[in-house]
Protein backbone atom coordinates (compact mmCIF):
# COMPACT_ATOMS: atom_id res chain seq x y z
CA UNK A 1 0.00 0.00 0.00
CA UNK A 2 1.31 3.45 -0.86
CA UNK A 3 1.93 6.12 1.73
CA UNK A 4 -0.50 8.98 2.16
CA UNK A 5 0.28 12.26 0.49
CA UNK A 6 -0.17 15.56 2.28
CA UNK A 7 -3.29 16.58 0.39
CA UNK A 8 -3.62 20.03 1.92
CA UNK A 9 -4.83 22.23 -0.92
CA UNK A 10 -5.98 19.36 -3.14
CA UNK A 11 -9.51 19.38 -4.52
CA UNK A 12 -11.47 17.81 -7.33
CA UNK A 13 -11.37 20.51 -10.03
CA UNK A 14 -13.13 19.02 -13.06
CA UNK A 15 -13.78 16.02 -15.22
CA UNK A 16 -13.45 16.25 -19.00
CA UNK A 17 -15.77 14.78 -21.58
CA UNK A 18 -15.45 15.07 -25.34
CA UNK A 19 -18.55 16.32 -27.13
CA UNK A 20 -19.33 16.26 -30.83
CA UNK A 21 -21.85 19.13 -30.69
CA UNK A 22 -20.88 21.90 -28.28
CA UNK A 23 -24.09 23.91 -28.72
CA UNK A 24 -26.28 20.85 -28.06
CA UNK A 25 -24.16 20.16 -24.97
CA UNK A 26 -24.61 23.75 -23.75
CA UNK A 27 -28.35 23.42 -24.34
CA UNK A 28 -28.56 20.26 -22.24
CA UNK A 29 -26.20 21.14 -19.39
CA UNK A 30 -26.99 24.86 -19.16
CA UNK A 31 -30.61 25.29 -20.27
CA UNK A 32 -31.98 21.94 -19.11
CA UNK A 33 -29.84 21.27 -16.02
CA UNK A 34 -29.17 24.89 -15.05
CA UNK A 35 -25.38 24.96 -15.19
CA UNK A 36 -23.51 28.10 -16.24
CA UNK A 37 -20.76 28.52 -18.81
CA UNK A 38 -17.78 29.51 -16.66
CA UNK A 39 -15.29 29.99 -19.49
CA UNK A 40 -14.87 29.01 -23.11
CA UNK A 41 -11.66 29.13 -25.17
CA UNK A 42 -11.14 28.38 -28.86
CA UNK A 43 -7.78 26.95 -29.94
CA UNK A 44 -7.69 27.50 -33.73
CA UNK A 45 -4.22 25.99 -34.17
CA UNK A 46 -5.33 22.80 -32.45
CA UNK A 47 -8.84 22.93 -33.98
CA UNK A 48 -10.65 22.47 -30.67
CA UNK A 49 -12.65 24.38 -28.06
CA UNK A 50 -12.59 23.90 -24.29
CA UNK A 51 -15.55 25.03 -22.23
CA UNK A 52 -15.90 24.78 -18.48
CA UNK A 53 -19.42 24.61 -17.05
CA UNK A 54 -20.81 24.12 -13.57
CA UNK A 55 -23.07 25.26 -10.75
CA UNK A 56 -20.57 27.41 -8.88
CA UNK A 57 -17.32 29.23 -9.26
CA UNK A 58 -14.65 27.14 -10.95
CA UNK A 59 -12.26 27.93 -8.10
CA UNK A 60 -14.69 26.60 -5.48
CA UNK A 61 -16.76 23.81 -7.06
CA UNK A 62 -15.99 20.87 -9.34
CA UNK A 63 -17.04 21.46 -12.92
CA UNK A 64 -17.25 19.77 -16.30
CA UNK A 65 -14.77 20.48 -19.05
CA UNK A 66 -16.38 20.00 -22.45
CA UNK A 67 -13.82 19.45 -25.20
CA UNK A 68 -15.07 19.93 -28.75
CA UNK A 69 -12.69 18.75 -31.47
CA UNK A 70 -13.81 20.68 -34.54
CA UNK A 71 -13.16 17.88 -37.04
CA UNK A 72 -15.00 15.16 -35.07
CA UNK A 73 -17.93 13.93 -37.17
CA UNK A 74 -18.84 10.66 -35.43
CA UNK A 75 -20.05 10.06 -31.89
CA UNK A 76 -17.39 9.19 -29.35
CA UNK A 77 -17.13 5.65 -27.97
CA UNK A 78 -17.78 5.63 -24.21
CA UNK A 79 -15.38 2.77 -23.67
CA UNK A 80 -15.88 0.19 -20.99
CA UNK A 81 -14.45 2.12 -18.05
CA UNK A 82 -16.80 5.08 -18.06
CA UNK A 83 -19.47 5.13 -15.38
CA UNK A 84 -21.45 8.32 -14.92
CA UNK A 85 -21.49 11.92 -13.73
CA UNK A 86 -23.49 12.42 -10.55
CA UNK A 87 -25.61 15.55 -10.20
CA UNK A 88 -27.24 15.71 -6.78
CA UNK A 89 -30.68 17.22 -6.17
CA UNK A 90 -32.94 17.61 -3.13
CA UNK A 91 -35.80 15.64 -4.76
CA UNK A 92 -34.77 13.08 -7.38
CA UNK A 93 -38.40 12.12 -8.09
CA UNK A 94 -39.41 15.71 -8.91
CA UNK A 95 -36.19 16.30 -10.86
CA UNK A 96 -36.86 13.25 -13.05
CA UNK A 97 -40.48 14.31 -13.56
CA UNK A 98 -39.39 17.82 -14.60
CA UNK A 99 -36.61 16.53 -16.87
CA UNK A 100 -38.98 14.04 -18.53
CA UNK A 101 -41.37 16.89 -19.33
CA UNK A 102 -38.46 18.63 -21.08
CA UNK A 103 -37.85 15.54 -23.22
CA UNK A 104 -34.89 14.10 -21.31
CA UNK A 105 -34.88 10.30 -21.43
CA UNK A 106 -34.67 8.81 -17.94
CA UNK A 107 -33.03 5.42 -18.46
CA UNK A 108 -33.40 4.25 -14.86
CA UNK A 109 -36.35 5.66 -12.88
CA UNK A 110 -35.72 6.90 -9.33
CA UNK A 111 -35.43 4.18 -6.72
CA UNK A 112 -33.06 2.67 -4.19
CA UNK A 113 -29.65 1.72 -5.52
CA UNK A 114 -28.87 -1.96 -5.79
CA UNK A 115 -27.87 -3.38 -2.40
CA UNK A 116 -28.47 0.00 -0.74
CA UNK A 117 -31.03 2.57 0.31
CA UNK A 118 -29.81 5.74 -1.40
CA UNK A 119 -32.31 6.81 -4.08
CA UNK A 120 -30.75 7.29 -7.51
CA UNK A 121 -31.85 7.70 -11.13
CA UNK A 122 -30.19 7.85 -14.53
Positions of predicted regions on the chain:
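Short acidic-aromatic low-complexity motifs
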Residues: 17-24
Amino acid sequence: MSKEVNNDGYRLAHTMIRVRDLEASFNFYCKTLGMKILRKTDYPDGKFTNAFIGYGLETESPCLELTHNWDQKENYDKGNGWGHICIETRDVYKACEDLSKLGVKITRPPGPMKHGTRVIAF
